[in-house]
Amino acid sequence: MAAVATLNAQTQTVQATLAGGADNEHLCVSVGQPFFQQKTLGDYEFSMGVAQAQWTRDTVYDVITYNTPYTENGFDLPAQTTTHKDSAYLVNGGIYNYDLLRTLYLIVCPEKVTDAFSSGIEYDVLAVTGHCWTKQNLRSPMSDAMSYTCAMYPTVPENYGLLYTWNTAINGTVADNDGYVKGICPNDKWHLPNAEEVDALISNPIVALRSENDWFGPEINTNATDFTAFPAGCYNASSSRFEGLYTQTDWWTMIDPGSGGGSTHKTSLELPCHCYTTLLVTRDPNDAISVRCVMKNEWPE
């Protein structure tokens, strides 16, 4: 079986061109670094180890990197410098025909990304349902960024981030040629979440998105996705008060609120407590809520 691949570290994109000869569960690809092991069936053979994958239509593969020597495959692999983390492998295509030459495009989430306004702030990155997200809420030091001001319940910026009005979150940016809006996100590869990305995220159970700790309510949160949504609350502009700490969290989105929301209102994604469903909320743009960012899925031409 013929197989070639290239790794572009700058774009974090792996392109593997695969030829026939594989069966329905196994296909070998040599791509060098890093080493991945997939958590489902089948095998990819990498120069530094074996990564397993199951071939299905438009599949997203969640993989794990290792930071300790891994020798179960007999390759006696060296220790990796990265920590254990999930990444996304996105297959751009339909059902694979193994007797035909096909191209497999893979996107790997970076481990961290640096804040756009402070080089001293970094955010972890994780893959959730086919997209790379910042694992923490942004805490960019904007002049009008807010922190929850309840003396009884001080928040932890590293966990809860800061709260931003719509105009601050957008930061004067407009949609690029691909329709993405960067806002205060780390760099031009990152943007505020759109409808497709939000839909993919909330296809997960709400308990799998919420942090295991800090939430009021009877639900048992699993944080199975590692998204770690802390209940950061919000600032309500109409009442000029902070509310919702430990009971809800919201993020600005680029979802059109529709005619019912009014021309100035914007849409947030809300995770409430005492509830097993996520909400899309039409908000006053002067409200201040959290911001998370998503990385573009850029496929080669």
Region roles according to the model:
Residues 1-4:
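Bacterial N-terminal signal peptides
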Residues 6, 22-23, 71, 224, ...:
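A generic alpha-helix preference that emphasizes hydrophobic side chains
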Residues 7-11, 42, 47-109:
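Proline- and Ser/Thr-rich low-complexity, intrinsically disordered segments
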Residues 10-54:
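Residue-level hotspots within well-ordered secondary structure
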Residues 31-41, 86-93, 267-285:
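Short, surface-exposed beta-strand/turn "edge" patches of beta-sheet domains
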Residues 110-301:
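Conserved positions within compact, well-structured domain cores
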